[in-house]
A protein has these predicted regions:
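Short, aromatic/basic amphipathic alpha-helical patches
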Residues: 20-32, 93-98, 116-127, 207-214, ...
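N-terminal pre-catalytic "stem/leader" segment of glycosyltransferase-like enzymes
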Residues: 1-94, 111, 193-199, 204, ...
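Short, surface-exposed amphipathic charged segments that create phosphate/polyanion-binding patches used
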Residues: 53-58, 145-151, 238, 316-324
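Catalytic binding pocket for nucleotide-activated donors in carbohydrate/polymer assembly enzymes
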Residues: 236-240, 247-357
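Catalytic core of nucleotide-activated saccharide and alditol-phosphate transferases
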Residues: 73-202, 209
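Short, solvent-exposed loop/turn segments at secondary-structure junctions
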Residues: 15-18, 44-46, 84-88, 111-114, ...
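Catalytic donor nucleotide-activated moiety binding site of glycosyltransferases and closely related
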Residues: 209-247, 290
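Short, glycine/acidic-rich beta->alpha junctions
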Residues: 20, 60-62, 207, 245, ...
Length: 358
């Protein structure tokens, strides 16, 4: 049996964006007793970031990832978690090449084996790149440990923008228990489909716009659809404008919907909505999943729910499912169970931990 001095450590370097990592951090915090390790937070950059290879664009992109260190006796190494949208190395945003050279494992949510094999530069690191499950922004349970990063200042090299992001994490994002608690919400809406508008993602916006038009055509009544923009919408999109909802209000409205809709995120990546809708236990109709397919399509009813890549088909299938509430209920029950047994923070991170100890 290990003594306290021999207990393994997993160290998170709190030196960048953490909103996308809150899901995984909750998992690391929760799994400490089960796997007999300590989860520690260092408010500094790992030593390897001082290397000249991390200047320029690499230095900018690397802080979007989660940077960690595993220490277990003489078995010490760095690993990273990448929740970025790209499955390819488009504009060097899909992978951080210098980081791939350093870490033992590069855990990636938007894992795509074909994209890896098609890129000779990335393929060299194939064995390091490990697929992981979905995530979405969550309140971190031990948020007090992140408090020193709230106030900007020269001493901690923390900007106002980064401090604002940290405050959002503290007060804006809900706890997972809140989402699970919404599973029994009375469903008095047919559809709630309100999406952000990304000025730099024209194709994505147009697809969502076409889905909205198709929903209006086929579902027609008792629906809330539109964009919730942070700046003025193009004139032809303004008919579908919605207010920016407070986060908990947004989820309450999602929970009210009889059928939820899933569309892919930027660059055809996994949207955080996937995990959120599963956590809410909603029946889903939506686009096919492009990345990490093997992880998802083995689950009950995923082949039926994530099967439609045309806006008209999505809207028609939503209307069809609305006519069959028993089928929708079976989807909902299965999705809640899939999240609880396969995609919760604790279970998702347990797969990472088992790899670290392997």
């Amino acid at each position: 049996m290990k003594t306290d001095k021999e207990i393994a450590e997993i160290i998170y370097y709190d030196c960048g964006e953490v909103t996308a990592l809150g899901f995984y951090i909750n998992g690391f915090l929760s799994d400490q007793i089960k796997y007999n390790y300590k989860f520690l937070i260092k408010r500094e950059k790992p030593s390897f970031l001082k290397h000249p290879s991390f200047t320029g664009e690499w230095g900018k992109f690397v802080l979007r990832l989660g940077l960690f260190e595993f220490k277990n006796g003489n078995n010490n190494f760095f690993f990273s978690i990448d929740r970025s949208d790209h499955s390819t190395n488009f504009k060097n945003e899909g992978y951080i090449i210098p980081l791939l050279e350093i870490v033992k494992y590069y855990f990636k949510a938007n894992y795509n084996a074909t994209a890896i094999d098609n890129d000779p530069e990335i393929k060299k690191y194939r064995d390091k790149i490990i697929p992981i499950g979905p995530s979405f922004p969550l309140h971190i349970e031990n948020m007090i440990k992140f408090m020193p990063r709230v106030l900007p200042g020269k001493n901690n090299n923390w900007t106002f923008k980064e401090s604002k992001e940290r405050l959002n994490l503290m007060f804006r994002n809900p706890r997972l228990s809140y989402l699970r608690g919404l599973r029994n919400t009375e469903t008095d809406l047919n559809v709630f489909f309100v999406m952000p508008y990304y000025p730099n993602q024209k194709i994505l916006n147009e697809f969502r716009f076409e889905v909205m038009k198709a929903l209006q055509k086929h579902v027609k009544t008792n629906l809330i659809i539109g964009f919730a923009p942070t700046q003025k919408l193009p004139e032809n999109h303004q008919y579908f404008e919605q207010p920016v909802y407070e986060m908990r209000t947004y989820f309450r409205n999602l929970a009210r919907s009889k059928v939820a809709i899933y569309v892919r995120g930027p660059h055809d990546g996994l949207s955080s909505k996937l995990g959120q809708l599963l956590a809410l236990g909603k029946p889903i109709i939506g686009q096919t999943i492009h990345n990490n397919k093997e992880l998802y399509y083995q689950n009950p009813f995923f082949n039926e729910q994530f099967a439609y890549d045309e806006p008209e088909d999505i809207a028609k299938q939503v209307q069809e499912l609305l006519q069959h509430p028993e089928k929708a209920a079976s989807f909902a029950k299965a999705n809640a169970n899939t999240f609880d047994t396969k995609f919760s923070p604790e279970i998702t991170v347990s797969k990472i931990i088992e790899k670290l100890f392997d």
